[in-house]
Amino acid sequence: MAPEMSEKGPVLRLLRPGPIPREDLRKIAKVIKPKRTKADHIEAPGQIESHYAPATPLMVIDKPADFVPEEGVKYGLLSYRGEGNSSLMEATEWAHTEIMSPGKGKLAEGAVRLFYCLRKLDAAGVDVIISESVSETGIGVAIMDRLRRAAAGSSQK
């Protein structure tokens, strides 16, 4: 975020979603998203489309029913809350599972653990990482932004 002043008060240029939700920032300042022109005008590494990408292909699944596992593929699961909270848990036999917010279901904890869990899955030797989506409210907007960027470079969609 880069603060600026205008005749009407403070203006925040939101480079990418972060831990403070846009709705909260709007309470204290006007919030704008900078216009993107060329890749060489990127102001923060997180603005690069695939900045957060693991080496292992990553797919973000919004609806568990949309995931159909392929035979012979070793899948890793990035789960938000873990057992009993996702029908993705039952979709296949997972080669490795990482849970962002074990037993708690707290978006803030999920945000803190996101890259730790992605790196563990990347090192686990799976063929594809499957990630559940999270609610796009509050810090969930930032989590989904990071997940989409991580999946952007994947050959599998």
What spans do the regions from the language model cover?
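Active-site-adjacent structural elements in enzyme catalytic cores
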Residues: M1-K157
